[in-house]
């Protein structure tokens, strides 16, 4: 069973993602801040990370950069899932090391398809 880390400061979004992911057989971890997400990524070494951009303190772009630059976690695929939908946000997310960028609200089928794509690629 693949382990997925959700990093999102919205309890509502985290709950929604947890429901979807557990329904599809994934083990789910979660963090509500970018800093906690980086720490949990380093300690739990999830198979994939879903991360929001807008969070207090360390934002999703900064956390993505830290995770993808660290030797221990650089192999973990990161998918940004955010309400920020400008092309510049997508480009910046990819430059920080994200493998993909989905815009909220994301449909369940689309989310699962992208997750499978990156888990199977590893």
Predicted regions and their residues:
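Charged docking surfaces used in two-component/phosphorelay signaling
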Residues: 15-23
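Short hydrophobic/Thr-rich beta-strand motif most characteristic of the beta2 strand and flanking loop
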Residues: 25-32, 40
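Active-site beta3 strand of CheY-like receiver
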Residues: 44-50
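Receiver (REC) domain active-site loop signature in two-component systems and cognate sites
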Residues: 55
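Short, glycine/charged-rich "phosphate-handling" switch motifs in NTP-dependent
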Residues: 99
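C-terminal output helix
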Residues: 106-115
């Amino acid at each position: 069973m693949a382990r997925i880390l959700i990093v999102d400061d919205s309890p509502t979004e985290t709950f929604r993602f947890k429901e979807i992911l557990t329904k599809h057989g994934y083990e789910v971890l979660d963090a509500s801040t970018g800093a906690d997400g980086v720490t949990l990524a380093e300690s739990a070494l999830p198979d994939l990370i879903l991360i929001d951009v807008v969070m207090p303190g360390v934002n999703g772009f900064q956390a993505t950069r830290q995770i993808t630059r660290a030797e221990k976690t650089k192999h973990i695929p990161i998918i940004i899932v955010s309400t920020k939908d400008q092309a510049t946000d997508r480009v910046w997310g990819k430059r920080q090391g994200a493998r993909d960028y989905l815009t909220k609200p994301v449909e369940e089928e689309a989310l699962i398809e992208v997750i499978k794509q990156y888990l199977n690629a590893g």
